[in-house]
Amino acid sequence: MARRARRPRGRFYSFRRGRWHHLKRLRRRYKFRHRRRQRYRRRAFRKAFHNPRPGTYSVRLPNPQSTMTIRFQGVIFLTEGLILPKNSTAGGYADHMYGARVAKISVNLKEFLLASMNLTYVSKIGGPIAGELIADGSKSQAADNWPNCWLPLDNNVPSATPSAWWRWALMMMQPTDSCRFFNHPKQMTLQDMGRMFGGWHLFRHIETRFQLLATKNEGSFSPVASLLSQGEYLTRRDDVKYSSDHQNRWQKGGQPMTGGIAYATGKMRPDEQQYPAMPPDPPIITATTAQGTQVRCMNSTQAWWSWDTYMSFATLTALGAQWSFPPGQRSVSRRSFNHHKARGAGDPKGQRWHTLVPLGTETITDSYMSAPASELDTNFFTLYVAQGTNKSQQYKFGTATYALKEPVMKSDAWAVVRVQSVWQLGNRQRPYPWDVNWANSTMYWGTQP
């Protein structure tokens, strides 16, 4: 029994381990115990700029007849992209490809299942090394061996974007499916996922936790900003427009804000209506260009830019994102991680349960599993990540960039994310369908009793 002592002004002490310990009590301003917070850290101040859950209300819906809880736990490596040219000067662009240290992690059941699939050479690309079959193969054989993978449009286009976070993840699933490797040795399609959960037709998201740690320095100042958002309402419309077609995500345009000079009222006007991620398209000045052309650039070489856009480091910081400093810029502790927690469906309409497999579906096909019949790929939350630096291009808004290089036998991760997620499957069908007929007839076929 530890000895206790009380001093004036409410100071308590306890004697243990050979000395007196001061019990640091919280102020008794409230009836119950509350931790004192600084005013500028209050939730109301942060929600004035970005509200991750802009309102919800509960709706009384009938609970399913039976439920099953599914848990995911794993790690996600946010790595730098690689390029797979056949030679070092493929098309003249291989040595001039630059990427930004950005990522977008979508919380949906489809991508969590893809992240937990078998780690075999025929089922998962396995990180930033896209694989020689994808880089060199352009016939049907490559598509047969690598289903649901993006084939490069030419040999200087990366075959995977940072949105495909599950390619660089190792995820464990509980309960496990002992027959999954034999039934689905390749990447699972929506049809395969529907057959895997053929006995369940509802699902809901309970909770997902992220713990992000910056792992790579980029100059003397390189924190990683991360912001959790509801659904996809911070994603630009152009991302949704081209989300299903990776090959058309590249467009040829002008040099993106690198100091080009234009005259008169042509293109390249420096107004705020032009997205910095979507540079203008000035005409190329050649020897055959007609005289009197009003647009002149310091460099007449046009550049390629991608439709796949992400939030910059400055944008995330302005919205109140957390910062994680890499080792060397701050001592590693629990506070070195960015902690994010997402609960519920994140749906202002109060839709708690979502459709996994539509009722009355005897033969599960991809047409049934695609929206709106199935909501398997519905995004409940999105985690936006970007690394900043003190030296960056003006049009990148403080985001760290790097030159895409050819693959080596190692991956270069600039952030690591620990993930824990809980989902629940439900079924409103009766668990025992063995019914009896009201009447039976033993007469011959075609006659009536």
UniProtKB/Swiss-Prot annotation:
Induction: VP1 and VP2 are detected 12 hours post infection, while VP3 only after 24 hours. GO terms for biological process: endocytosis involved in viral entry into host cell; viral penetration into host nucleus; virion attachment to host cell. The keyword Heme does not apply. InterPro entries: Capsid_protein (IPR007291). It holds the Pfam family Gyro_capsid. One of its GO terms (molecular function) is DNA binding. It is found in: Host nucleus; Virion. Residues 6-47 are annotated as: Nuclear localization signals. Homomultimer (Potential). Interacts with Rep; this interaction relocates Rep into the nucleus. Belongs to the gyrovirus capsid protein family. This is Capsid protein. The gene is VP1.
